């Protein structure tokens, strides 16, 4: 049998975060070759990660990076809040955020190259060490030159679970910050009514028409009734139409008009939703 030194075992543990026996067995299988042992453990980690892929990931955190011309928001998920607040998971999220900072989609983010192969490989290997399914669930890139980034903790002992990036034009940074906070709490899906996909809008219009007809409303006034009821949909889902959370007597569009701000775009993630 190959003589395995504790120094090599310790080195392998430090590199991959695996247990003593796993490190020792990998070194034995690799004939004492540390790099080969690393590959053996990585392969085992990827295989064990595949077995966990179907398990629900409803915990985790959001992390962001901001640059001169763009900002990115990522949601890294795991199975339990215990892992979500662990130092290793937090370190993983920071490394992933750095690696994917130039990506333009979730698919390209997962393919970004790193020492472990790709970001997807890195996450799978760390999942093996953490013993949970871990996934980069969502990724958004927001273009612009001025940003307000707001990260919200839903619990003081957990990392941020709600994240918002707001790209805007104007100079009222304080109001931009308040609007980013508004987005975090009001959860709009669209910036303007024009951003709602026509298919979704038409389905909602058809549904409201049938509801109104079932209530016995006259056919000739159904279009007006439906359009009136669509206002509720807009209030729930469209940022510019929402009542401002700091003053519900005015809408976000009125706040922007009064302060000279213009929202270019935004991204919002809440872990597990």
Swiss-Prot record:
Signal peptide: none annotated. Residues 80-83 are annotated as: Involved in Mg(2+) ion dislocation from EF-Tu. GO terms for molecular function: translation elongation factor activity. It is found in: Cytoplasm. InterPro entries: EF-Ts_dimer_sf, Transl_elong_EFTs/EF1B, Transl_elong_EFTs/EF1B_dimer, Transl_elong_Ts_CS, UBA-like_sf. Disulfide bonds: none annotated. It holds the Pfam family EF_TS. Coiled coil: none annotated. GO terms for cellular component: cytoplasm. SUPFAM superfamilies: Elongation factor Ts (EF-Ts), dimerisation domain, UBA-like. Keywords: Cytoplasm, Elongation factor, Protein biosynthesis. Its main location: cytoplasm. Associates with the EF-Tu.GDP complex and induces the exchange of GDP to GTP. It remains bound to the aminoacyl-tRNA.EF-Tu.GTP complex up to the GTP hydrolysis stage on the ribosome. PANTHER family: ELONGATION FACTOR TS, ELONGATION FACTOR TS, MITOCHONDRIAL. Belongs to the EF-Ts family. This is Elongation factor Ts. The gene is tsf.
């Amino acid at each position: 049998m190959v003589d395995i030194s504790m120094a090599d075992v310790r080195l392998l543990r430090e590199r991959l975060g695996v247990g003593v026996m796993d490190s020792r067995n990998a070194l034995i299988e690799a004939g004492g070759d540390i790099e080969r042992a690393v590959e053996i453990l990585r392969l085992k980690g990827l295989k064990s990660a595949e077995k966990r892929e179907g398990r629900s990931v409803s915990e985790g955190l959001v992390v962001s990076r901001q640059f001169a011309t763009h900002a990115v928001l990522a949601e890294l998920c795991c199975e339990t809040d215990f892992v979500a607040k662990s130092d290793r998971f937090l370190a993983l999220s920071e490394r992933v955020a750095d690696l994917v900072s130039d990506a333009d989609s979730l698919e390209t983010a997962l393919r970004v190259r790193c020492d472990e192969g790709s970001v997807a490989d890195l996450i799978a290997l760390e999942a093996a060490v953490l013993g949970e399914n871990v996934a980069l669930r969502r990724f958004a890139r927001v273009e612009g030159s001025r940003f307000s980034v707001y990260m919200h903790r839903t619990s003081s002992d957990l990392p941020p679970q709600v994240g918002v990036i707001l790209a805007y034009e104007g100079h009222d940074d304080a109001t931009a910050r308040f609007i980013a906070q508004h987005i975090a709490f009001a959860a709009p899906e669209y910036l303007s009514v024009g951003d709602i996909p026509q298919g979704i809008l038409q389905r909602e219009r058809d549904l409201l028409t049938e509801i109104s007809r079932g209530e016995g409303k006259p056919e000739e006034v159904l279009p007006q009734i439906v359009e009136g009821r669509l206002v509720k949909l807009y209030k729930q889902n469209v940022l510019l139409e929402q009542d401002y959370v700091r003053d519900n007597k005015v809408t976000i569009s009125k706040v922007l008009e009064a302060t000279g701000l213009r929202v270019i775009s935004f991204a919002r993630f809440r872990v597990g939703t």
